Amino acid sequence: VYLSPWDAHSPLYHVDREADYNAYYLAQLKEILSNPNYGNAGKFAEVWMDGARGEGAQKVNYEFEKWFETIRDLQGDCLIFSTEGTSIRWIGNERGYAGDPLWQKVNLDKLGTEAELNYLQHGDPSGTIFSIGEADVSIRPGWFYHEDQDPKSLEELVEIYFHSVGRGTPLLLNIPPNQAGLFDAKDIERLYEFATYRNELYKEDLALGAEVSGPALSADFACRHLTDGLETSSWASDADLPIQLELDLGSPKTFDVIELREDLKLGQRIAAFHVQVEVDGVWQEFGRGFTVGQKRLLRGPLVEAQ
């Protein structure tokens, strides 16, 4: 649910009435989050509080901690998007593009409505709190529906996907309803095309069960865990950097995307990676990047390699 802290139409929104306004906002939170008819049968995945405040608006101080406490009391582990170092932060732009590197850690004293956009986009490897940078963008040119505008092309959505989800962070794609409260047919068609593309992208894991050689920390973190397809296992090593791993796919496979994932239960630790493929007996670069995080999608040339 998106409930902006700035209510431009409320007569209570004034520095002389901060206590009244904060109570007013808190009452709205309680009304929405405690009603079983709202959300998904009363459950909410995320409460979205942006940092917007119009030019010339009163600089009312918000009682964020009281609001956050109420959200947690009523919705448990519901994610909170805000400027205040909560579980989700803004990525620093409204294009849906995350940075590389992208650390999901930040320092609280560098956040707030005046936070540097570059800091939000890349995070901080020395950060003291875990706050995921959420990439947000609209399927249309703006956040609201206009009849004379069209949705983004499939190619544009694919680029956004690889620069957000493909860089280890969630994508919030805005779909504005029209004046009848319905999604436009063109938007719906584009969403189906986008879903078809993603389904095709993940249709087959060519590396599933592939033989992997390289150093490993222990049997509990063996190399085979890299390709066993299980969410509960992972590989790790304490060897000196750079660490090299080699995958044998068993037979030549044709591909142009490689997916890497990191076991975030152990923290976000990968700071750089480099992928090569052997083509006709010669090793050549496929691609490289910095952080991995929850998921990294690396695009390269279409190759046939084992």
Range-by-range predicted roles:
Residues 283-285:
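Tryptophan-centered short beta-strand motifs
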Residues 1-225, 238-239, 259-261, 268, ...:
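Mature catalytic domains of secreted/periplasmic carbohydrate-active enzymes
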Residues 5, 139, 177, 251, ...:
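Non-catalytic surface loops within mature trypsin-like serine protease
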Residues 210-212, 230, 243-262, 275, ...:
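Hydrophobic/aromatic beta-strand segments within beta-rich folds
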Residues 268-281:
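Short, surface-exposed beta-strand/strand-loop-strand elements in extracellular ectodomains
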Residues 231-235:
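Non-catalytic extracellular/lumenal accessory regions of secreted precursors
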Residues 241, 254, 267-271:
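Short loop/turn segments at connectors of secondary-structure elements within structured domains
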